[in-house]
A protein has these predicted regions:
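Symmetry-related core transmembrane helices of the 12-TM Major Facilitator Superfamily/SLC fold
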Residues: 149-165, 359-377
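Intracellular juxtamembrane helix-capping segments at the cytosolic ends
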Residues: 19, 97-110, 307-320
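Helix-loop-helix hairpin linking two adjacent transmembrane segments in secondary transporters
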Residues: 120, 125-172
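Hydrophobic core of transmembrane alpha-helices in multi-pass small-molecule transporters
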Residues: 3, 71, 82-97, 213, ...
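Extracytoplasmic gate region of multi-pass secondary transporters
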Residues: 12-16, 197-255
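Conserved MFS/SLC helix-loop-helix module at the cytosolic interface between two early adjacent transmembrane helices
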Residues: 43-81, 262, 268
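C-terminal transmembrane helical hairpin of 12-TM major facilitator-type secondary transporters
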Residues: 219, 239, 245-315
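Interfacial helix-cap and linker-helix signal at transmembrane-aqueous boundaries
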Residues: 19-20, 51-52, 134-143, 230-231, ...
Length: 384
């Protein structure tokens, strides 16, 4: 499910060129669809977590999977910006919203080595980013962009609906880790930690929200604009699309390496390393013009992306416990979605105004380094 949800989402940058060529839209306007998507996605993450608690993840995620497939089906019929914003900005966002319930299931099933378990689940995200964008680019060259979206819709619908039927919550107790985790009843584990009201009063909650904001601002700005930026530097479209594949492949490695570092040392250390690497990679891409320099950037950026992505769920469990895990994580994602929404628009506006992405990349680098500073301020408090 992670492969299809995030692989198709990160393919939007591949369709950027066809949209601009066919309709003559500016980059800022086209980016607005991604902005609306991430805003609605962030809002719905909070509600999907609550609905999953009440109705169960299988029902909620099945319905969302159907809506996701319909969203991509309707994308093949886009003729105006209103269509683009409705189908991609609303329908696809609704279909993506079970992301938080999926991560909360992992946090509750596994009581130890959460970083490693999260890495395994989220590796599907990196796999999707690695495989789907170049496949989408190949489809566009073969059958044009409208038919490509039809293929994506059918495949996404079949895989996500089928996979959602296997989801379930632990009925009595969390899975015992191979290392020998404590055998605590599920009901007890569910009530560990701070309530949502208690959590929002802490400094750590504010830091979590800023970490999410800076992370998603940088991430979505890059995934939306990096392909069209590379093409603008005379890198062939097929090779430019590979930058997303390098991000996806390195993302898988980053998830597993940083997940293990978090389990062995702490989420704080792993998060600091990830933000440092992301900031440095964004500085590197500013003067880059060659294919190899873009691939090197994509590898470093993707590794950092994977590290951050895998750490937020166990970080919430470490800082606040699992009592309100889904709602706290969903609220952080909601704040982060603001960054994800305005990031691509700001980057597109900067390019439309100046003809260059330089200022956009500098802004992303600054935000990444502020994320590093914020991660160093995190402190674990007693869960009472």
């Amino acid at each position: 499910m992670m492969t299809m949800i995030w692989g198709t989402f990160n393919s939007f940058g591949v369709f950027f060129g066809p949209f601009i060529r066919e309709f003559g839209w500016t980059r800022a306007i086209t980016s607005g669809a991604s902005a609306l998507n991430t805003m609605i996605f962030g809002i719905l993450c909070v509600f999907s977590a609550g609905l999953s608690e009440r109705l169960g993840p299988r029902r909620v995620i099945t319905v969302c999977s159907i809506i996701l497939g319909l969203g991509y089906f309707f994308m093949a019929r886009v003729t105006t910006t209103s269509d683009l914003y409705l189908y991609y900005g609303v329908f696809v966002a609704i279909g993506m919203s079970p992301y938080i319930p999926l991560l909360s299931l992992v946090a509750r099933w596994f009581t130890t080595n959460r970083g490693r378990m999260n890495a395994i689940v989220l590796s599907g995200m990196g796999l999707g980013i690695m495989l789907v964008p170049p496949m989408a680019n190949q489809l566009i060259s073969m059958v044009q962009w409208r038919n490509s979206y039809l293929v994506i819709a059918i495949v996404t619908l079949m895989i996500t609906v089928a996979a959602s039927q296997f989801l379930k919550v632990p009925s009595h107790q969390a899975l015992e880790d191979r290392d020998g985790g404590p055998d605590t009843p599920w009901a007890d584990r569910r009530n560990e930690g701070l309530s949502f009201r208690q959590a929002v009063r802490t400094r750590e909650f504010a830091l979590l929200c800023w970490l999410y904001f800076s992370f998603l601002f940088c991430l979505v700005s890059i995934t939306v604009h990096i392909v069209i930026h590379a093409i603008g530097l005379d890198i062939p479209a097929t090779h430019a699309a590979l930058t997303l594949s390098f991000i996806g492949g390195a993302c898988i490695l980053g998830m597993n390496v940083m997940g293990n570092i978090a389990d062995r040392f702490s989420n704080k250390i792993a998060l600091g390393v990830s933000y440092s690497l992301m900031g440095c990679s964004l500085v590197w891409v500013i003067p880059s013009h060659s294919e190899w320099s873009f691939y090197l950037f994509s590898t470093a950026f993707g590794f950092a992306y994977g590290g951050m992505q895998v750490l937020f769920s166990p970080l919430v469990a470490e800082l606040f416990g699992t009592r309100a895990h889904g709602v706290i994580l969903g609220t952080g994602a909601l704040v982060g979605s603001i960054g994800a929404a305005i990031g691509p628009i700001i980057a597109g506006y900067i390019f439309d105004a100046s003809g260059s992405y330089t200022l956009a990349f500098i802004l992303c680098a600054v935000l990444a380094f502020t994320g590093l500073a914020s991660s160093l301020l995190l402190q674990r408090r007693p869960l009472s």
